[in-house]
Regions:
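Structural motif corresponding to the intra-repeat A-B loop/turn of tetratricopeptide repeats
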Residues: 39, 52, 72, 107, ...
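Short, well-ordered secondary-structure microsegments
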Residues: 39-101, 105, 418-433
Length: 437
């Protein structure tokens, strides 16, 4: 009954507000937006300013938040705002343009990203009075953002990072170290293992390039190279090395507030604990409760994906978090770079549930995504999963063919763990497949 009265009062208040003069409504929306922004509630601030059509205020909030919470909105909402926002207003906010360029990349809205870059460069060109230092900072930060178009070619990205570092005299404004570095992926290695047979070179490149990136971004993603080293060691069966690299990464990121990188460590620790006798990881319920208190849905999804993967491997399907157990990934906003990883983990859940035909049916589209983003490790794992699914359905020729492809891709880098993790389903095939490599 109390809810009904509350709803009636809310409707009455909304009707009374709608009857106010337009200028008065805009003034109130501006006051709401200012209060929310002052208290760090940027999504509410954006909503209020948009209702009041205060485009300058919206753009300032996006800059203040560095676009972190834009991930909670749909691309369509943000694109509609950009279409409505006057060009001159956009051009007056060059730092916001940089933030928006990065967000367009994560949504794979590349034409819009390039359109915003052109607007930024035109704005810089139109203001010759701009101090040289600020001009160089804007152009350098533009190089930094454009490096994402070379994702996940580590060397190509690093060339643009070094170009940016040569220009910039301040840290980047458009990237905050509390924001997600992995775009929501639970694994660094899944993001950056690009070419079978080149894992060693990729690890060397990551160790060489990250210090330049850290200097530009106040340490955003700190520990990424150590996590990637640890993951590579884990997949190669070098468990002691994996544990050492993991603890080095944890020491690096301790106390720096980068929950994203800590969650990648957590995923690695949980996989390692399935292989060797180590201290038990923190119980999922405890960790999840701590994450809930942070009110960040991306962190929760990363953690849920790690728990779902490990529970699926061990057949503990009742322990799989609801997002994956209910196969509800399609209901949430995922950034494009992390989608193949999340879909691969959902595949592992389907396999644990015995939905083998579903795994096979999904594999072609998922492998196409992996090819588009050069995700060699995710593709390897999808082929292994699909091979196990074919084997479970008695389709041995198809299973052996896919397993052979996976073994040929994994052998040059000595990647063993993905096969071991699916050992129950692959064991009858492995001996025959090894003969035919």
């Amino acid at each position: 009954m109390s809810y009904r009265f509350h709803h009636m009062m809310k409707v009455c208040a909304e009707q009374a507000f709608a009857a106010l003069p337009e200028q008065t409504r805009r003034a109130y929306h501006g006051r709401y937006g200012a209060w929310y922004a002052a208290h760090g509630q940027y999504l509410h601030a954006l909503a209020a300013y948009r209702k009041g059509e205060d485009y300058d205020a919206v753009l300032q909030v996006i800059q203040d938040d560095a676009g972190i919470l834009l991930a909670a909105l749909s691309p369509e909402e943000v694109l509609a705002f950009l279409d409505a926002c006057p060009r001159d207003t956009l051009q007056a906010h060059p730092l916001t343009l940089l933030v928006l360029m990065r967000r367009m990349f994560t949504w794979q809205q590349i034409p819009k990203m390039l359109e915003l870059r052109a607007l930024l460069l035109a704005g810089i060109e139109a203001h010759p009075e701009l101090p040289d230092a600020e001009r160089d900072n804007l152009l350098g930060e533009c190089d930094l953002i454009m490096s994402f178009l070379q994702y996940n070619d580590i060397a190509a990205m690093s060339r643009l990072h070094r170009s940016a570092a040569a220009r910039m005299t301040r840290p980047a404004i458009s990237i905050r170290n509390e924001g997600s570095w992995t775009f929501g992926s639970p694994s660094v290695l899944m993001m950056f293992h690009r070419t079978p047979g080149q894992l060693g070179a990729e690890l060397d490149a990551m160790n060489a390039c990250m210090p330049h990136y850290y200097r530009l971004t106040n340490g955003h993603g700190q520990g990424a190279e150590q996590i990637m080293d640890a993951e590579a060691a884990l997949l190669q069966g070098r468990f002691a090395d994996a544990a050492i690299f993991l603890e080095c990464a944890r020491a690096t990121i301790a106390g720096n507030g980068q929950e994203n990188m800590a969650l990648c460590c957590d995923f690695l620790e949980r996989r390692l604990a399935l292989c060797v006798d180590t201290a038990a990881p923190e119980p999922p319920a405890h960790k999840r409760a701590a994450l809930l208190a942070q009110h960040d849905t991306m962190w929760l999804r990363i953690f849920d994906s790690a728990c779902a993967y490990c529970a699926a491997l061990t057949g503990q399907t009742e322990q799989i978090p609801a997002l994956f157990r209910d196969h509800a990934l399609h209901t949430v906003h995922l950034l494009a770079p992390c989608r193949p990883m999340m879909e691969m983990i959902e595949n592992q859940v389907y396999l644990a549930e015995g939905a083998c035909a579903r795994v096979i049916g999904r594999s072609e589209g998922l492998l196409a995504q992996c090819a588009q983003q050069h995700y060699a490790l995710v593709a390897l794992q999808v082929r292994i999963q699909t091979s196990a699914a074919y084997a479970a359905l008695g389709k041995r020729p198809e299973a052996r063919s896919l397993l052979g492809q996976a073994l040929r891709a994994a052998a040059p880098d000595g990647l063993l763990l993905p096969f071991a993790e699916n050992g129950r389903g692959l064991r009858p095939l492995l001996e025959l497949s090894l003969i035919h490599i």
